[in-house]
Structures are given as C-alpha cells and as structure tokens.
C-alpha cells in the first residue's frame, strides 16, 4: 500500500490540478506497483501538503507572492 506525500507551495495548485495529480499518480502506481490490477487503486494513498511561501527556501531564494502569481498565471 503506497503512501505518496506531495509537498508544494500554497497557491500553486488549484482544485482541478490537484484532481489531475491524484488521478495520474494513482494510475501510475496501479500500472507499476499494482502490475495493472485495477483493484490496486483502492490501496493508493496520496496527500498534498501545501505550505506558505515563507516556509520554503532554495539556496538563498524564497518564493514571493509575485513569483507565485507569475507561475500560476
């Protein structure tokens, strides 16, 4: 039973994007780990955790509200 935890910056994913991620990731795990057995779908757990931009940093760069707006527009 896989548990997939996605961590992302708050505001990057809308409801439709999250639904698409859930579907595609589940499909991938059914295909690979479940060996194509559709019943395996019931055992795939996925969680999306969103964190405010100020809780992220890459090197010395933290995302700003303007950066997020550019990425989502």
Ranges and model annotations:
Residues 2-73:
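A domain-level signal for the structural core that forms small-molecule/cofactor-binding pockets
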């Amino acid at each position: 039973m896989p548990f997939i935890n996605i961590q992302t910056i708050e505001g990057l994913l809308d409801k439709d994007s999250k639904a698409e991620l859930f579907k595609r990731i589940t499909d991938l795990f059914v295909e690979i780990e479940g060996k194509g057995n559709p019943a395996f779908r019931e055992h795939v757990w996925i969680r999306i955790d969103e964190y405010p931009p100020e809780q992220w940093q890459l090197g010395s760069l933290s995302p700003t509200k303007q950066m997020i707006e550019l990425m989502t527009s």
